[in-house]
């Protein structure tokens, strides 16, 4: 479904209603999800929020891929894995190009 999910998001009744995107990245699964074995669970300690759904997806995606590479689950990003984000960018749903995303990090240490 991920290869075509951009089509659903581009549907006019949905497209104009998405104004804030929040992704819970406090605890995540980097392999075998959604009900992964404990060795594939990690604490990203992150909440992603933005008005651009594609940019939020891209930043979250990059976090998971980096963890997969760090843990030896894969050696590099798989070709075409971001196709759904590139398609969403073509539909002008948001920005998939990491170089064009304005990322603001806020550290909330207790």
Residue ranges of predicted features:
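Extended, low-polarity segments enriched in aliphatic/aromatic residues
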Residues: 1-110
């Amino acid at each position: 479904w991920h290869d075509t999910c951009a089509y659903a998001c581009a549907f006019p009744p949905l497209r104009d209603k998405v104004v804030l995107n929040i992704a819970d990245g406090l605890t995540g699964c980097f392999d075998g999800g959604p009900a992964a074995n404990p060795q594939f669970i990690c604490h990203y300690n992150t909440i992603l929020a933005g008005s651009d759904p594609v940019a939020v997806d891209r930043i979250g995606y990059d976090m998971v891929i980096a963890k997969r590479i760090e843990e030896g689950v894969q050696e590099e990003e798989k070709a075409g894995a971001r196709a759904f984000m590139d398609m969403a960018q073509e539909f002008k749903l948001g920005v998939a190009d990491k170089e064009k995303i304005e990322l603001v990090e806020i550290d909330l240490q207790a």
